[in-house]
Amino acid sequence: MAHFAELDKNNVVLRVCVVDNKHVPSDKHVDGETWCTNFWGGTWKQTSYNNKSRGEFASTGWLWEPTKEKFYVAKPSGHDSWTLEETDSKLTWQPPVDWFNTEDCKLADNSDVKITINTWNESAQTWKGQHHKTEANGNLTITNFTWNKSTKVWDRD
């Protein structure tokens, strides 16, 4: 079985369909794309779970980049400063401040903390994080942090 993504005029994926291999005999994307166009109409591009030559497996709402011949997810809302970059043969949105390891983080006082929730703050151009801890009495304590891009440690808010 082969998978093909239908594209609109703006290269947005409308749907992904499965096509029997008997309709795509040569295992070349052009044959299958032509078959889909002849059968359903529209513009089609092959996508694959197994072969990542076209980036990630396409999903509805994703985009097709014709110059790179890759599918990629649309830019997340509220992430205007992020740029599309090709990494590990796929297209991904990258923040202007490097990602960090949330499992083994240092605070400004050099103590360790595990950040369990983190989000991008576009207006501050940095990461916001939270550490959740359940106390012995069952109460939940939430501590808020801001990533300090200069020192590369978490500052308590």
Locations of regions flagged by a protein language model:
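Interaction-interface detector
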Residues: M1-D157
